[in-house]
Amino acid sequence: MILYSHLSTLIDIDLSNNIFLAKLPEAYAIFDPLVDVMPVIPVFFLLLAFVWQASVSFR
């Protein structure tokens, strides 16, 4: 428990185990849903490569 309290002071661990990286300013709060989806966009490009190759029969 002492180690946890020491680490929590160094790293500021959230007790609810949520990963909290940053919060957008209030003026940009309407973009929160878009920002939540943005990390997944590169995966779509990877999947697009497979769909493209399937459409040309993996030539």
Curated annotation (Swiss-Prot):
InterPro entries: PSII_PsbK, PSII_PsbK_sf. Signal peptide: none annotated. Keywords: Chloroplast, Membrane, Photosynthesis, Photosystem II, Plastid, Reaction center, Thylakoid, Transmembrane, Transmembrane helix. It is found in: Plastid, Chloroplast thylakoid membrane. Residues 1-22 form a propeptide. It is a single-pass membrane protein. It comes from the Eukaryota. The chain crosses the membrane at residues 30-50. One of its GO terms (biological process) is photosynthesis. The keyword Acyltransferase does not apply. One of its GO terms (cellular component) is photosystem II reaction center. NCBIfam families: PRK02553.1. PANTHER family: PHOTOSYSTEM II REACTION CENTER PROTEIN K, PTHR35325. One of the components of the core complex of photosystem II (PSII). PSII is a light-driven water:plastoquinone oxidoreductase that uses light energy to abstract electrons from H(2)O, generating O(2) and a proton gradient subsequently used for ATP formation. It consists of a core antenna complex that captures photons, and an electron transfer chain that converts photonic excitation into a charge separation. PSII is composed of 1 copy each of membrane proteins PsbA, PsbB, PsbC, PsbD, PsbE, PsbF, PsbH, PsbI, PsbJ, PsbK, PsbL, PsbM, PsbT, PsbX, PsbY, PsbZ, Psb30/Ycf12, at least 3 peripheral proteins of the oxygen-evolving complex and a large number of cofactors. It forms dimeric complexes. This is Photosystem II reaction center protein K. It comes from Chara vulgaris (Common stonewort). The gene is psbK.
